[in-house]
């Protein structure tokens, strides 16, 4: 007698292979840029707070991605610009931040704060290549800094964050442009 029923594994595996995978659904979204994005909780912080002349901007591209762009100046002892996003985010069950970015072959910093009372941030540098990439940053690899100086404290081990930022400050005068699709936890 001919067996017309295939084992289930021979049916499910090929079907799963052709299902669309939405990488954005993996983990917890912190911010997903799109054409309707609001920048209500975003702020630009330049070296102008100390007399510098750098200028950063945040905008939305036609494709819906965010664009952090501008110019870093070393005049008047400056040399950085940043964009910051304020939101209380629980990190329970997650140990990485994923940045989906398209860069300009420059180094940037991801910066987080776990409390509004903290003067320091936890920082991790990353290289943004000129192609879309998922930058995966373990939270435990983020080191404490204050005004660019390392602190003698433990790396990040918090349960939440209240602020997330991107900063460029490579000690050279330069234009920059970093496209951001989304920021999520994994």
Question: What is the role of each PLM region?
Answer:
Residues 1-12:
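Bacterial N-terminal signal peptides that target proteins for export
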Residues 2, 22-186:
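Beta-rich carbohydrate-recognition modules and glycan-binding surfaces
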Residues 14-22:
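Hydrophobic h-region of N-terminal signal peptides that target proteins for export
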Residues 13-14, 39:
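N-terminal processing/targeting junctions
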